[in-house]
Every structure is written in structure tokens, then in C-alpha cells.
Amino acid sequence: ITLGIHGVIHNDQISFTPYYSLSEFDLSSFLNQRFNTKVFIENEANLSVLGELSYMPNYKNIASISVHSGVGLGLFINGDLYTGFSGYAGEIGHTIVDVDGRDCPCGNKGCLEQYLSEKALLKEFKEATNLDYVDFDMLSSMYKLANKDAIAIFQKFVKYMTVCINNILNLYNPDIVIINSSFTHHFPELTKDIEHSLNSRLNDVLHIYPSKLHHTSILLGGVSVAVKDFLDINDLRFVSK
């Protein structure tokens, strides 16, 4: 069993989750006893980059940005998944973009996640339109109709994604950046807008692509973790080089 969690994972143990409390609960042992099988717990963005890697065998340095209810970053550096000393590497959603900004469940103010996540952007759209309920399909439909509030939300997505990628480039210098988000899945041309917004001369060789796997990238990453352990191998690709 492989579980993808929105939070910090270290050695199959949950250290921090921003929107629910699991840090005091040994979920791995509980599921192991319940189902009598090995259990792997990993950050969902890390699973996402492993899923993407399975179809991109020619890259050794990949940054995969997952934008859903939060914002996560999976990093594959020099051929290895990078999680840092205690699993906190890749928590790009909790880097600060406004020191006096919105409160975040992590305890800080102005975290990127509070401006870039689909949850945050849909909340902004709901407040701007005074609608009782919104979802991404509604936002998408109104964007296609050139609704000014929907356009403003898409512009904010491009703005904060540009900030996010600029920071990633300067910190990790990946070969390729993959964006896994409903925005870029349904509107892949947004990646070109983001590229045009990256003004630094350091970014000339960068490749930015929308994920072709979307939600299945996490699933495929989970499969990769379990199969590699079962076969006792270090590398697994779903396509040939």
C-alpha cells in the first residue's frame, strides 16, 4: 500500500499536515496491522515527480509543482528524489511571498499556498462574484466567456506561479519544470504566459511543461514506490529511453 499525503513525511511517518492532524498517529503501523502488508507513506508532490519521471527517462533534474488544495514541490536532483534532512524539502507552498500577508495553518503569514493553491484562488473567485458555490469547472467556463473576475484569477495564477518557478530555478536549477494543476491541464497555453513572465537572464534554457498525467501522476508514483520495493530495484521507468 502506498499513500500520498499533503504534508511532511519522514521515514514513512507523518511529521506535519497543514489541514488535518495526523502527526501523533502512526498511520503506517496501523495500516500494516490492519492489512498485513507493507505500507509506504510519502508526500504527494514527491509521488507526483516519481510518476512524471517514469515517463521522462532522459531527465536527471526535475522539479514537479503540484497545485491542488495546497502547493507542493517534488524534486529529482542528480538522479535521486530529494527530500532533505527530515523530509521538509519541497515545501514550496510554505515559502513566504508576503511577510504581512494571509494567515497560514503552518503558523506563518503570507505563504505562497495562500495565494496560488486552487483552494485559495477559488475562494477569491467566490468572494469576487458573490456566488454561493464555485468549483474549477465554473471558473473555467466563465474564463472562456471572458468574465473579468475569472480572468483576474487566471492572471493571479500566472503571477504567483512565476514567482514560484523563479525561486525554484535559482535554488535548484532543474532541467525541466512540470506544473501539475487544473489550470495548466485545461489551459496548457498558460505555461507560455509563465515563461514570458520569467524575466531573469538565468532562465534562458528552462523548459516548462504542463503535466500530461495530471491526477494520475501521484498514483503512478505510488505504484513506482511499491514495485521498486517488491522487485528490489532502484529505478523503474514505464517507457524506454
Model regions and ranges:
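Glycine-rich phosphate-binding loop and adjoining helix at the ATP-binding site
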Residues: 1-61, 189-199
